[in-house]
Amino acid sequence: MDKKLLEILACPVCKSSLIYKKADQELICKACRLAYPIRDDIPVMLEEQARQFDPEEEI
């Protein structure tokens, strides 16, 4: 994931910043508790494609 791209991306739901989780190839929004998948190095920033994650899940 390109660092500059990560700096400009925001959660499409709440506009919060995102955290890159390399091991799972996801972008995490802590505010919404959503994890957006990254497929073929392209972030899929669609709410319906995101998964809800448990607040106790390690980020």
Curated annotation (Swiss-Prot):
InterPro entries: Trm112-like (IPR005651)
One of the record's GO cellular component terms: cytosol
Superkingdom, natural source: Bacteria
Pfam families the UniProt entry points to: Trm112p
Gene3D superfamilies reported in the protein's UniProt record: 2.20.25.10
SUPFAM superfamilies: Trm112p-like
Family: Belongs to the UPF0434 family.
Listed name of the protein: UPF0434 protein Noc_2677
Species: Nitrosococcus oceani (strain ATCC 19707 / BCRC 17464 / JCM 30415 / NCIMB 11848 / C-107)
Organism taxonomic ancestry: Bacteria, Pseudomonadati, Pseudomonadota, Gammaproteobacteria, Chromatiales
